[in-house]
């Protein structure tokens, strides 16, 4: 399994629509204003989060249960900035829509800018032939409110290509998050 370069990422985005919308270079300024970088890097792609968030509040249930998650546990927020309460989390989605090739597994890592502030980004791998907007989870590990900025870089996707194509892809098995759009809550 090998990690893919900026050249490969550009080629796959342009020819195969792997990432839409796509920035072929790193973007560090928008309208002469400094932003947290996003776009193509040497061996990855830095994604942005959209301006729709679901902020977790612990007012409706005593237990968090992935098999019976209560949607009322979230407050919907739309805006350029999302404030996450201390020791809580928020869900968001990428601006970018992904179409992962059959021979590729994509890993997401948080950006150091957020990690250095105690904000952790978590995403499970994007499996072969999965497509959709990526649901992002931001954990605020601090005892202070934390800000997340919409339309700026939040995480980096790394593309790993296998030396052998898988027998069964995410699409083949009818994965439950296939084609997701918007922030998607847990499904069982």
Swiss-Prot record:
Catalytic activity: dCTP + H2O + H(+) = dUTP + NH4(+)
Keyword Manganese belongs to the record: no
Annotated InterPro entries: dCTP_deaminase, dUTPase-like_sf, dUTPase_trimeric
EC number: 3.5.4.13
Keywords (A to Z) from UniProt: Hydrolase, Nucleotide metabolism, Nucleotide-binding
GO biological process, alphabetically ordered: dUMP biosynthetic process; dUTP biosynthetic process; nucleobase-containing small molecule interconversion
EC primary class: hydrolase
GO molecular function: dCTP deaminase activity; nucleotide binding
Record keyword RNA-binding present: no
Pathway(s) of this molecule: Pyrimidine metabolism; dUMP biosynthesis; dUMP from dCTP (dUTP route): step 1/2
Signal peptide: none
Amino-acid positions noted as binding dCTP in the UniProt annotation, renumbered to this chain: 111-116, 135-137, 156, 170, 180
Active site (record annotation): 137
Listed Pfam families: DCD (PF22769)
Domain of life: Bacteria
Quaternary assembly: Homotrimer.
Family affiliation: Belongs to the dCTP deaminase family.
Protein function: Catalyzes the deamination of dCTP to dUTP.
Protein's recorded name: dCTP deaminase
Organism, scientific name: Chromohalobacter salexigens (strain ATCC BAA-138 / DSM 3043 / CIP 106854 / NCIMB 13768 / 1H11)
Gene encoding the protein: dcd
């Amino acid at each position: 399994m090998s990690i893919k370069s900026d050249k490969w990422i550009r080629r796959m985005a342009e020819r195969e629509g792997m990432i839409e919308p796509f920035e072929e270079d790193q973007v560090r300024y928008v309208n002469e204003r400094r932003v947290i970088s996003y776009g193509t890097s040497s061996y990855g792609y830095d994604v942005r989060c959209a301006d729709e968030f679901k902020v977790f509040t612990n007012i409706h249930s005593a237990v968090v249960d992935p098999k019976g998650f209560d949607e009322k546990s979230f407050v919907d927020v739309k805006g350029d900035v999302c404030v996450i309460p201390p020791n809580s989390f928020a869900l968001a989605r990428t601006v970018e829509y992904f179409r992962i090739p059959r021979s590729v597994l994509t890993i997401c890592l948080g950006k150091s800018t957020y990690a250095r502030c105690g904000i952790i980004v978590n995403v499970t791998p994007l499996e072969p032939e999965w497509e959709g907007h990526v649901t992002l989870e931001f954990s605020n590990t601090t005892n202070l409110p934390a800000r997340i900025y919409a339309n700026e870089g939040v995480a980096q996707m790394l593309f790993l290509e296998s030396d052998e194509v898988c027998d069964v892809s995410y699409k083949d098995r009818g994965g439950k998050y296939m084609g997701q759009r918007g922030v998607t809550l847990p499904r069982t």
